[in-house]
Amino acid sequence: MSPYTLWAAVILLAGTILRLWYSTHLELVGDEAYYWLWSRHPDICYLDKGPVIAWFIWVGTALFGQTVFGIRFFAVLLACGTGIGIYLLARKLFSDKVAFWSVVLAAMTPLFAVGATLMTIDTVYIFFWTFAALTFWQAKDEEKLRWWILTGILIGFSMLSKYTGAIELLSFGAFGVWHPPSRRHFRRPTFYAMLLVAALFLVPVLIWNWRHGFPTSQFLVHRGALDERAHIRPLEVFSFLAQQAGVISPLLFFGLIIAFCWPRFARTAKIETGYLVSLFLPLFLLYLFLSFQKASQANWAAAAYVGGLILVAAKWTEALRTRPHLRWLVIAGVGVALLETGILHETSWLHLPGGLDPLDRARGSRDLAAQIDELQRKTGARFVIANKYMTAALLSFYLPDQPDTFMPVSSPPFNQIVLWPTYRTKHP
């Protein structure tokens, strides 16, 4: 075992232990409580996304009870798995040294470091995205179907976690077009076997939507602001890019831009670099394009940074070999990222206003539930109706005995709660 492998393992193991400890120090955020509700209503699909995250939460809560730790347990393990996948991919493409620094970047990047504790969709689908990227790199040199089928399975689980997992197929196709030796797979059953296997995972999605009137398509159109009149809003594009710089860390994002826009800055293996570009650009450009209408949320392009961070590690490792005077810039970038990540794990000492505190959404739900419970005792109200799905989910988790909570029925439905039995049905 090389020293780089050993130290990467130490970082991943220590990070996992710390995150398991830290996971109970924050209240649930709205998304986590919402997906926890899914796990209490098993189904083959849900309005927003596929069922994979609900499966993980169901197993976690079966092991550790209906608790914050039970919900977040697999988030921490999946994040560790993603780190392992990043190391294996970077080592296969470049070297142990680049792989080590790729793990370091992922561990200290705010988007990955903070997200590794929360049981969100991104934590799940990035795990499958990372290993699909690893198996496809092996598959491209194979004529046998086993690696192609495995890649299709991983893409399938990625899509059942978040539908944008399908964009990785576009990444693979783009690489195949760019890389002449890989073009042969377009004339053989290998590439299409991968597509077929991945497509089979969408069968439960289609069945569920057929039973419910295809609400997912309406939800996705609304979510992407595609139901609004088309506009070009430069400020929204700027907002998207600023958000990306914030969640990656400004200097690391600057380093990523240099790695992509200045190929001669540091020479790295052409084919391997092209593969990382193909992993990054399709997903990133999709959300950049959508931001001309409305800026996406900061985390939506997260999977693109699996390839992006490895490319940064490869380019800047080589750059330091030929330009040692840039070491100060690398140290500054690492320092800023570590500082930002550290602050994001505990912000109470900063006394930030609610709108500026990134952890504000992970506080207050327990107190709100206590006040609601007291109000129910005084008034005799039998159930709770919330105006937002995250509020309804959080109250369901934190109220005594974790009762069902409800929302006003909307048409078309834009969250899963309104598709379940309503308060009129359960409390006539």
Predicted features and spans:
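Hydrophobic/aromatic-rich transmembrane helices and adjacent perimembrane loops
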Residues: 42, 254, 274-275, 284, ...
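Membrane-interface transmembrane helices that cradle and orient dolichyl/undecaprenyl
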Residues: 91-97, 132-148
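Short helix- or helix-capping micro-motifs
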Residues: 12, 102-110, 114, 155, ...
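Transmembrane-lumen/periplasm boundary regions of multi-pass, lipid-linked membrane glycan transferases
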Residues: 18, 157, 169-273, 279-294
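Transmembrane-helix signature of polytopic, membrane-embedded enzymes
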Residues: 5, 86-108, 127
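Membrane-interface alpha helices of multi-pass inner-membrane proteins
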Residues: 102-103, 147-163, 198-199, 238, ...
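Membrane-proximal, lumen/periplasm-facing interface regions of secretory-pathway glyco-
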Residues: 298, 323-380, 389-420
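Short acidic/glycine- and proline-prone juxtamembrane loop motifs at membrane-interface regions
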Residues: 111, 117-125
